[in-house]
Amino acid sequence: MFSLQELCRKNIYILPYPLGKHVLQQLGLYWKGHGSLQRIGDDHVLLQQDLIFSINEALRMAGEEGNNEVVKLLLLWEGNLHYAIIGALEGDRYDLIHKYYDQIGDCHKILPLIQDPQIFEKCHELSNSCNIRCLLEHAVKHDMLSILQKHKEQIRLHLALTQILFELACHERKNDIIRWIGYSLHIHHLETIFDVAFAHKNLSLYVLGYELLMHKVNTEAAYIELPNLLSYHLRTAAAGGLLNFMLETIKHGGYVDKTVLSAAIRYKHRKIVAHFIHQVPRKTVKKLLLYAVQARAPKKTLNLLLSSLNYSVHTITKQLVHNVVIYSSTLIVKLLLMRRKNKLNLVDAVLARLVKYSTYTDIVQFMSEFSVSPERVIKMAARESRTFLIEMISKAAWGNHPQTLIHHLKQLAHTMKSQSGKDLIIYTIHYIYLNSNMLVAEEEKNIFKLAKFYANHNAVNRFKQVCEDYYALDVDARFKTLILECFEIAVQKNYPRIANIVDDYVRFLFYRGDITEEEIHEAYSLKDAEFYVDLKWLQHDLF
């Protein structure tokens, strides 16, 4: 516990009136050789009513003199013991250090407070467990170059230690020490200085790295693949957007090529691309544009590349389309469409490739982005035999109502030029028909139209099945009308198989008495009808 005197000394800031030397000595507020000692504020002292010092500076002075009484007083005033130890080292007061040794803790914590290399080394010696390597590492951390110079020969004998100290100096960014090690000692690997320079975007460290690299190249016989190293540095600098680093590398023989600018594009550093784009061949710019699409570069970067090509990309259209589809990068398509002059429409080409190779989700996204009609996509899907797409896009566009779906798909079949595509749409229509509940009297008109549609497109088997279904609805008069109209279609379009099916139904209806001889003769009186049917059966039955 504190004594009453200590409590008074600790908490009295301003003395009530000037006290005599004897009273001050009794209070412990007298510093031999200096005079009265008074606390001012939280961290200063007044000496002999005249001089003001920080408490820690006063501690250093007291430690240097070995005045333990003043040290104890200043510690009561919340001074830092480390300054007393520094002063004791300066005055070689090891007896004072011994008294406080257990309170010091880690001596390394005192080192940042020391400016004098000799005191620095003496302080480090207080720690019995440390060796020369520990001293040298702390010398690097705290910029004590003279200590390193003092132990130069010892460092030189240990190549591994040299490398360790060099790398530590790089991480601590101690340029003077790095330069000294680089010129005075042998460094096996220089990579660390560049790694740290890139990590902290420290240009001065990067320049120093090249200074040491060129010194090493010119003075040592070691083989260094300088072109590869320069290229690597350029790519790294481009990826980090460090133009000044790139310019420094170029001074030493670096060359900006496609891989370097690709790194700038990938990490969205347009200013670097803009700085060098006019220094590379046109062929390289085209490759960079393709890569920019792949990397989904922003609008400004794409426009920069397109502008340098005068928006003339016809020779790489196929590759552009490929990259747009593979990497889902459609911005280039929009930019080319926005041009008033030299406009290039890649929508159809991209859409065709999407329909052929991509997923339903990708296609729908593209349709939404470029306002593509479902009819357009369904026709493409039919040409590529992608039944699933036809079904999914149809339902997404027109709902899941069978009659609506069939109506729209029939319209597409009428305008479809590709026969295989038309057949697939008809197949889809029939699939919808078979999986719906249309075979009811209420759907008679729709089934009638569907049968005529099949007849118009020579869909023989589907026509036959729908006719059978339609007959099952028991609408004799309408069935006869359907059969006769379909016969006319078959004759006009030269569909013999449809005509044969109709002829079979005509005979059936005649035997049932649902159609007269006159109606048959009238229907079969069409031009060229005799090439499709033989009326001898009718004459034979009449007689």
From Swiss-Prot:
Function as written in the Swiss-Prot or TrEMBL entry: Plays a role in virus cell tropism, and may be required for efficient virus replication in macrophages.
Pfam families: DUF249 (PF03158)
Highest taxon listed in the record's lineage: Viruses
Protein's UniProt name: Protein MGF 505-10R
Organism, scientific name: African swine fever virus (isolate Tick/South Africa/Pretoriuskop Pr4/1996)
Keyword set includes Cell inner membrane: no
Alphabetic keyword roster: Early protein
Protein family: Belongs to the asfivirus MGF 505 family.
Induction record: Expressed in the early phase of the viral replicative cycle.
Record has Amino-acid biosynthesis as a keyword: no
